[in-house]
């Protein structure tokens, strides 16, 4: 079956479903790397992607945002001039109650009320003020970091804002 739209999983109610030792068949998160670029660089500013609303971000959306930001930064500023880090981890296991999806299926299957469902993926729960992604750059690459995070935010299902913080004393805030 195809993947359901993100709107089915964006909002949440109730506690997170995270106990993997009791859940058989949880798929692995699609996020390949959580830290990219030059880890040991000397940077001036830290740009953060901060969430405005509470919700859930699926692991494939986090991976799409990571790929978009990393590709833009590596092509514009070079691999040695930035450090990109994903700050959230998709712990919450998403479930889906599989239903028949073809013509006339409504006559064959009513479905059970409040059916539990099988694990289909994972999501990260975020709240207002949660930092999802951070980019560290030098002063001359600040505009590229802003554009990379703007592109990454377009891949996420919730609204976000970009905040810059100076890493060294004496630098003025942006």
UniProtKB/Swiss-Prot annotation:
Question: InterPro entries from the entry?
Answer: Ribosomal_uL16, Ribosomal_uL16_arc, Ribosomal_uL16_CS_euk_arc, Ribosomal_uL16_dom, Ribosomal_uL16_euk_arch, Ribosomal_uL16_sf
Task: Report the PANTHER family cross-referenced here.
Answer: 60S RIBOSOMAL PROTEIN L10 (PTHR11726)
Matching entries from PROSITE patterns are given as: RIBOSOMAL_L10E
One biological process term in Gene Ontology:
translation
Q: Name one Pfam family in it.
A: Ribosomal_L16
* UniProt KW Secreted keyword: no
Q: Which domain of life is it from?
A: Archaea
List the protein's name: Large ribosomal subunit protein uL16
Source organism of the structure: Staphylothermus marinus (strain ATCC 43588 / DSM 3639 / JCM 9404 / F1)
Q: Which GO MF term does the entry hold, naming one?
A: structural constituent of ribosome
* Record key words, sorted: Ribonucleoprotein, Ribosomal protein
Concerning its family, UniProt says:
Belongs to the universal ribosomal protein uL16 family.
Task: Name one cellular component (GO) term.
Answer: ribonucleoprotein complex
Q: What is the lineage of its organism?
A: Archaea, Thermoproteota, Thermoprotei, Desulfurococcales, Desulfurococcaceae
Coiled-coil regions in this chain?
Answer: none
